[in-house]
A protein has these predicted regions:
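Divalent metal-binding segments
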Residues: 3-10, 14-244, 271-323, 337, ...
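In a subset of proteins, long, contiguous C-terminal domains/tails are tracked
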Residues: 4-5, 9, 31, 51, ...
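Short aromatic-centered micro-motifs
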Residues: 22-23, 264, 483
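Conserved, mostly hydrophobic/aromatic
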Residues: 51, 146, 198, 259, ...
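Non-cysteine beta-strand/loop elements that form the S-adenosyl-L-methionine
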Residues: 64, 256-274, 359-368
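Short, hinge-like loop/turn segments at secondary-structure boundaries
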Residues: 152, 220-222, 244-247, 332-334, ...
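His/Asp/Glu-enriched, well-ordered alpha-helical/loop segment
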Residues: 185, 304-315, 319-338, 342-343, ...
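Extended hydrophobic/aromatic segments used for targeting, binding, or gating
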Residues: 216, 220-256, 260, 345-352, ...
Length: 494
């Protein structure tokens, strides 16, 4: 990825009053200061930023890139306020674009946690007949099938048609299947869209073997992002056979692909009432009244210890407070390093344990905006410690921000806005005492790079039409003028 030297003139660093020049050479920040163009050499390119703000490029610390690419192509049912409303959206699509034989209508984005009516196969069947319809929830933890949709996915029958967690997740390989070439084109399009928002890298936690598809995509020219590819337990032996450790650059990918962490999902989600909690969900009884523990400690601890011995960090999905307690217990028992993904509901004691154990909290602030009403109903009396970002920061916990795309948009400015404002759509802030300050939110979005640009750092930069620290800066809609990866433009709009 060798590129000629590039001088960004009249650049403004975050929070700075005066402009400087930024010299990029050999894929890194070579110098920051005044009048650098004179000594940059005859072959150097110059681009006048005209006072625009330049900062390290943004990372999304939790994505599912194929799911995100698929969601961008699927029927959007996120606006549905009831099962009946979702069915009307489905019928409108079927009327406009009838299915061709052998295909299914797949929608994405419903959240039934507050619906007045239950999503069932019978309801869908009464409306769509023999049409295979599959609607995936916004949190990816369940799906709603018509009877024909069940048959399409290879399921003979189901009592309700609403499949959650372990019933649903094995079916994603069928429901999500499209030819590699099509999926790769959609992922490339999604990658370019991310670059247009200042993104230079993602942590890829797709539920599949992630190295092979990204090797293929990069070889085919998808070079808009750096990718840190997580590995799931079924594919762990393949990574270990290559003797890859977390942080290793994968050979033959132009420095774009790194081995990421071991990913383990230990509980469910709030919307499905499967996040594993110390206290039961209101109105639920029986074995799952506290949610679902997908991976018990007796399996989790040795798995994490094994990965640690082989040089992998661990990324442990935990949403409910009991799941978080057990995840932290597992970090302590295994000696593993890494992150808890989501960390949505925490006890006060566990906030402190994140800090003492050195466990990173990988959080998705926009989920608080999506889940606030569901949390008020299903975590009533506990929401003061839900999405407790300020408490974690005050305890000295390292935070990284992400989207969990497609659960939230792959746009770090959306995450920063949600973290700082705790509000959306003109509503009052939800638990404003848990807001992050803006500097912390920005620092949690740039993969550990200093906001003021460090000499020697990768030349992965975002060029903005507004300083995010300026009063009234439009955080959620931050205008991004350009993005550079290793000193080459992946997006330029000026």
């Amino acid at each position: 990825m060798s590129t000629p030297p590039l001088v960004l003139t009249h650049a403004r660093l975050v929070g700075a009053a005066r402009t400087v020049d930024v010299l990029l050479r050999d894929g890194r920040v070579h110098a920051v200061g005044p009048d650098l163009a004179r000594g940059a050499g005859a072959g150097a390119e110059q681009v006048d930023l005209g006072g625009r703000t330049v900062m390290p490029g943004l990372w999304d610390a939790h994505t599912h890139m194929t799911q995100w690419a698929l969601a961008r192509q699927r029927l959007d049912v996120s606006a549905a306020t009831s099962a009946a409303h979702a069915i009307r959206i489905v019928l409108d699509r079927l009327a406009a674009r009838p299915l061709t034989p052998g295909t299914a209508l797949v929608g994405y984005g419903f959240r039934d946690g507050l619906w007045p009516d239950a999503p069932t196969a019978d309801l869908l069947d009464a409306a769509v007949g023999d049409a295979p319809v599959i609607l995936v929830s916004g949190d990816l933890h369940c799906a709603w099938f018509s009877t024909a949709g069940l048959r399409y996915a290879g399921v003979a029958a189901h009592p309700t048609g609403l499949l959650r967690e372990a019933e649903w997740l094995p079916l994603t390989s069928v429901v999500d299947h499209v030819p590699d070439a099509v999926a790769d084109d959609w992922v490339a399009e999604a990658s370019r869209a991310a670059a247009a928002r200042g993104v230079v890298g993602v942590v890829e936690l797709e539920i599949t073997e992630n190295l092979a598809p990204w090797r293929r995509r990069i070889a085919a020219g998808n070079d808009a992002l750096r990718v840190r590819a997580g590995v799931w337990e079924p594919y762990l032996d393949r990574v270990l056979a290559e003797e890859l450790r977390s942080g290793d650059v994968v050979v033959g990918t132009g420095g774009l692909l790194q081995q990421g962490p071991l990913k383990v999902v230990t509980d469910g989600s709030l919307n499905t009432r499967t996040a594993f909690c110390h206290d039961p969900y209101p109105g639920l009884t029986g074995a799952d009244a506290h949610g679902v523990l997908s991976v018990p400690p007796e399996h989790l601890v040795p798995l994490m210890a094994h990965a640690t011995r082989k040089g992998l960090t661990c990324a442990i999905h935990a949403i409910g407070d009991h799941a978080n307690t057990l995840a932290l217990d597992a970090f302590a028992a295994s000696g593993a390093r890494g992150s808890v993904e989501h960390a949505q509901l925490l006890t006060d004691a566990d906030v402190a344990r994140f800090a003492s154990l050195g466990v990173v909290a990988s959080v998705q602030p926009e989920h608080a905006m999506d889940d606030r009403d569901v949390a008020d109903r299903h975590w009533a009396g506990r929401t003061g410690r839900a999405f407790a970002l300020a408490s974690l920061a005050a305890a000295g916990v390292e935070l990284v921000l992400g989207s969990d795309a497609p659960v939230a948009p792959l746009d770090p400015w959306v995450a920063v806005s949600a973290a700082v404002e705790r509000a959306r759509d003109g509503r009052e802030p939800w638990h404003p005492e848990q807001r992050l300050d803006l500097l912390t939110a920005l620092r949690s979005s740039v993969d550990g790079q200093p906001l003021t640009l460090a000499v020697g750092a990768p030349a992965d930069l975002a060029v903005l039409d507004a300083d995010p620290l300026s009063a009234g800066a439009p955080l959620r809609e931050m205008p991004v003028a350009g993005t550079l990866l290793a000193g080459r433009w992946t997006h330029r709009g000026f």
